[in-house]
Amino acid sequence: MSLIIDSHAHVVVPPESYKFMAELAANRANPSLGVPKLSDETVRKAGQSIIDIMDKVGTDIQFLSPRPYMQMHSVKPGKVTALWTKHMNDLVYQTVQMFPTRFRAVAGLPQYRDTCPSNTLAELEFRVKEQGFIGCLLNPDPTEGDSLPPPGLGDPFWYPLYEKLCELDIPALIHSAGSCSPRESYTLKFINEESIAIISLLESEVFKRFPTLKLIVPH
């Protein structure tokens, strides 16, 4: 019997996480109070709400990741992004641990504006090697339209991340985050950034240099 797997799904964010998000945005992680631990009851309620829908439509397994438009990749300073990413990855991990037969974990990366993606590798490696995550999200424009974006995904700028993805033998799901542009909603940016990413990759030598690289384009 074959399984129906949803490879592109996101966690339900509980009220406690929204509170933490508001505090981070307000105090800019200065001072930092660390990352809150969500109760099992909170995580169970959020996870069960997803499973109820999965059961209705006949989905066996979902690959869960943080909600992309809430990743705060452009919010200054970078510590805000780092703490929020950790909190969301913790939520993903807790949810998968609670419902191991229904979910698999996909990590968010602490990408920050136009910073080299090598700053994301420690978080990615920890989640994969220590917690069994099976992939990650990759945002082509962590500036979220607020300033000049990094080069396209075909550029060597991204090679440190591609090397790590190949080393860990996991795929990345290409997914932009929010949008600061008044002429481009975050949902429109999802489509635009993936279109740009595809052309940039096709016109590059990325897959010659990294023949085992696995990328997913979901929209």
Language model features: what each stretch is:
Residues 1-219:
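Helix-coil boundary/capping segments in enzymes
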